[in-house]
Amino acid sequence: MHTGSLYPRFSDAEFSRRYTDVRAGMQQAGLSTLLVYGTTGSHHEVQYLSNFPVTREAILVFPGSGEPTLFVQMFNHVPNARQVSCITDVRWGGPATVDAAVENLRERGLAEGSIGVVGTIPFQQYASIRGALPQAALVDFTAQMQQLRFIKSDEEIEFLRKGAELSDRAIEALEREARPGITEHELVSIVEEAYLGQGGKNHIHYMATTPMRNPTVCVPAQHPSNRVIEKGDVLITEISAQYFGYPGQILRPFAIGASPTTEYKRMYDVAVETFNRIAYIPCGSNQR
């Protein structure tokens, strides 16, 4: 991990490894450059190469050689993007980010040939790129990028451990503070307060409550309700806190103010046994 930054950042050696691997894949696919597209909810490939978690929209121009350029929206997001990113050349994307990226390709002499496209690009933006680069062949490189990201480095595993630790904090807070008389909205507050001050961010906090002896839900809800928790309820959870894009995940049920019913205890015991059996699956096993 890079220790001289105000924000979490991987080491220069880690980014060098990523760039080398990605460029080897580009060469194999015959690509001169990549256009890596990201938005607030879908930005993993942009962050993987730039360290910047996209706040609205961003396009990374990533050439086969030379320095990349990161275009971000909005104008007032540029100063922070320059602090967070490992990319030296960070610019505002102007009125249309795709137009700025296309112009950058022209300046580099990369407006023709095969260009890799990474990410889920809205039709309007794709049509703009297609129309502005009639001599270029646009090739979807998303799957290849995702394949490269599947195998985590030692530094990434440390970030995942941090995400897991933050997720554990959330569950521990629920164990302490979940009680009859509070609402599901208050459960969300308990969860987030456990990790926000530690540099964590919310990834998901799905939760639901229901009477154990007369249940009406069987899975955590994606949106909390104003239901007031009662004695004899079960709280079911799916919690993922993230550390700079690297989340943990933990699922735990809680019996509120009473012992678990026979049915819920049986389901819990089966879940624990299933989880423990994962340890017997050897590396390299397939889904069969």
Go through the PLM ranges and name each one.
Residues M1-R288:
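Active-site neighborhoods and metal-handling regions in enzymes and metal-associated proteins
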